[in-house]
Amino acid sequence: QNKGRYLYKYAGAFLEEATFWCLKEKFPQAQKFRVANTIGKRPKQFEIDCLINQDAIEIKWRDATTDGDHITKEHTRIQAIKESGYTPIRIMFYYPNRDQAIRIQATLKTIYDGVGGPYYAGDAAWDYLQQYTGIDLKHILGTIAEINKGK
């Protein structure tokens, strides 16, 4: 189980970082950015994984949380981003497996929809990244995996 957690942690971090660099390649002005929490007291700021003009992109390889506080924090984060004049966009490459986590993702999608922020998950996330950047990261990673198969 520890090996699995280790793999998930680092593979996920790699995918999120690779996604940021795809966005940065297409849009050199892309940057990580913080907005003030104008809704609540904690945290004082929220990080935007990738800000490109008015697009505030949240990059997740997967979000398997089942914590109810997660919805509250995400709702506050999305509202603060919107109030700061940005469009919150979520791209999540892999959907969680557990029922409670799936329900939380459905709630988050509703929150994004409510502020006019797109929410892309699974294949839609890969497609969005390719359309937005012109870079087919899924294909690139598949090619790397194929080259290294059996090594």
Kindly give the residue locations of the regions a language model identified.
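Interdomain/boundary linker segments immediately adjacent to catalytic/signaling cores
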Residues: 1-27
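Amphipathic coiled-coil/heptad-repeat helices and related helical stalk/stem segments
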Residues: 16, 43-44, 74
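Secondary-structure boundary elements
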Residues: 24-31, 53, 83-85
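Active-site metal-binding core of divalent-cation-utilizing nuclease and nuclease-like domains
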Residues: 32-51
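Conserved catalytic cores of phosphodiester-cleaving nucleases, focusing on short active-site segments
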Residues: 50-61
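Catalytic cores of nucleic-acid endonucleases
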Residues: 61-113
